[in-house]
Amino acid sequence: INAGFPEESAAWGINQVCGSGLRAVAIAAQHVQLGDADVVAAGGQENMSLSPHVAHLRAGHKMGHMSYLDSMVRDGLWDAFNGYHMGQTAENVAEKWQINRDMQDEFAVGSQKKAEAAQKAGRFVDEIVPFKVKDRRGDKIVEQDEYIRHGATMESMQKLRPAFLKDGTVTAA
């Protein structure tokens, strides 16, 4: 409403962790393809760092300890069918299909190199809207993805510890 859209316009949010923005655009495209809409404004951003912790308070709370759930994990990263973190699913898939740590690291290095080359070639310039961030060091303009690991190597990937199991193969790479 504050953006100037009429009250009868449909709007909703999507909570699919990192895939939310992409899913919003895919749903928008489907609405246009199916003839449900002529024009759709869609986009997204993820902010997992600020996902709230939630408590069951509908019926109130009596004396004693109260548990909170991490909504980022519970709503987006928890396997509802098996009752464990999606990271465990990644480990299970790696084991089932015999995808070892070296194979995963090699894939990660390749992905990082492709992203680095695309960033250096300016392929993302039209995809990212620059914005100002204020922090204790002053204002900073963010105009490119900060998490591409320039100069990624197998050696740098192999220094990463397993993320989900002590002897696992899945890392942050």
Model regions and ranges:
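Proline- and acidic/polar-enriched loop/turn elements at helix boundaries
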Residues: W12, G44, P52, E106, ...
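Conserved catalytic cysteine-centered active-site region
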Residues: I1-D38, L69, F81-Q88, G151-A173
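N-terminal extracellular/periplasmic Venus flytrap/periplasmic-binding protein-like
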Residues: M103-A173
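A short, structure-level motif marking secondary-structure boundaries and short turns
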Residues: G13-I14, R74-G76, N100
